[in-house]
Amino acid sequence: MEKVYIVKLDWSTEDGNDTELTVYGTYDKAYAKFKNLIADEMNPENSWVGNLEWKDGIPADDKIELDFLDHRNDTDETECYWLITDTWNFGTHTYISIENKEVL
């Protein structure tokens, strides 16, 4: 069976929301997109996340919750995710993930 790797960006703020799906034939390409999306979110011109203060890779604001899972090694095809939520406004979040799917 063949595999495909779906990179999902799901975001929501008070101003709007959207979901973007991108399908890749290799895990390496999907993982590169996953990391690029996270980097893009850290840019204040692109996302609410970019306006946050960070300390040691974690949001400094206690009302912001970050949960993530990265792949463990270069040969692992982990279904990674990066979820950041404003716990005082659950409508404000960014969720980025890689999903591995088998296709017939």
Language-model regions, residue ranges each:
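Short aromatic-glycine-(Arg/Gly/Cys) micro-motifs in beta-strand/loop hairpins
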Residues: 1-20
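N-terminal cationic leader/targeting segments used for protein routing and processing
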Residues: 4, 30, 101-102
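A short, charged, amphipathic alpha-helix used as a generic interaction element across diverse proteins
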Residues: 12, 25-45
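Residues in flexible loops and secondary-structure boundaries
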Residues: 15, 31-32, 92, 104
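Short beta-strand segments
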Residues: 19-22, 94
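Generic detection of short hydrophobic beta-strand segments and adjacent strand-loop junctions
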Residues: 22-25, 102-104
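Short, mixed-charge low-complexity intrinsically disordered segments
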Residues: 39-104
